[in-house]
């Protein structure tokens, strides 16, 4: 949805295209123009791309067509609190959305924090496969807040997005890609 494209600040959603405000979901993310010619008259119909499948209970189901990155990441913790100097583990789950995803995962962190290991190699041969990787986080001596951002590199491409799917029977499926991070 258009209101989730930008990071929310101060309890408000930031919307770059103000003309969309008030719309339920906003325009379809992927649509095509179909050109027809009938008895010498030409016309064009714009239609959204949809993924159609059959469910034994619901019958025909139409989901919005979504283009996903090759890899998405999710963190086991949205927020980590360090009451002392003891290190904590942070687990990152990688999900491959294409075959043959091989690369390395690192964790961006504030300057005076330490993370071990510096990076972890991964190899995910099939789309849909997942890898659970773990980092140990060492906080600084002085209390400080910061962000831990997982960063997967495959060749010269970098991936930092987390996938959230919202699916209920009474609304269309909503797919949200947001920055993967731990506070």
Residue ranges, per PLM feature:
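Proline-anchored loop/turn motifs at beta-strand termini and strand-loop-strand connectors
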Residues: 1, 97, 101-127, 138-140
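Short, solvent-exposed loop/turn segments enriched in Ser/Thr/Gly
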Residues: 14-15, 27-31, 86-90, 131, ...
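Beta-strand elements of well-folded, non-transmembrane domains
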Residues: 36-40, 51, 94-98, 109-111, ...
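Short, surface-exposed loop/turn segments at beta-strand-coil junctions that are enriched for proline
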Residues: 1-24, 39, 123-127, 136-144
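Short beta-strand segments of immunoglobulin-like
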Residues: 76-83, 122
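Short beta-strand elements of extracellular/lumenal beta-sandwich folds
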Residues: 84-99
């Amino acid at each position: 949805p258009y209101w989730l494209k930008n990071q929310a600040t101060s309890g408000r959603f930031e919307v770059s295209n103000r003309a969309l405000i008030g719309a339920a979901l906003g325009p379809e993310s992927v649509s095509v123009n179909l050109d027809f010619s009938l008895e010498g008259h030409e016309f064009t119909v714009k239609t959204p791309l949809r993924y159609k499948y059959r469910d034994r209970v619901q019958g025909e189901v139409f989901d919005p067509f979504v283009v996903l990155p090759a890899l998405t990441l999710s963190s086991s913790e949205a927020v980590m609190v360090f009451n002392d100097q003891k290190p904590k583990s942070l687990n990152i789950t990688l999900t491959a959305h294409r075959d043959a995803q091989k690369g390395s995962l690192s964790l961006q962190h504030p300057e005076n924090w330490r993370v071990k290991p510096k990076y972890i190699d991964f190899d995910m041969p099939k789309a849909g496969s997942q890898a659970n990787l773990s980092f140990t986080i060492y906080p600084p001596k002085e209390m400080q807040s910061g962000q831990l951002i997982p960063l997967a590199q495959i060749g010269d491409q970098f991936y930092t997005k987390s996938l959230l799917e919202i699916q209920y029977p009474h609304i269309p499926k909503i797919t949200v890609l947001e920055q993967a991070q731990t506070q």
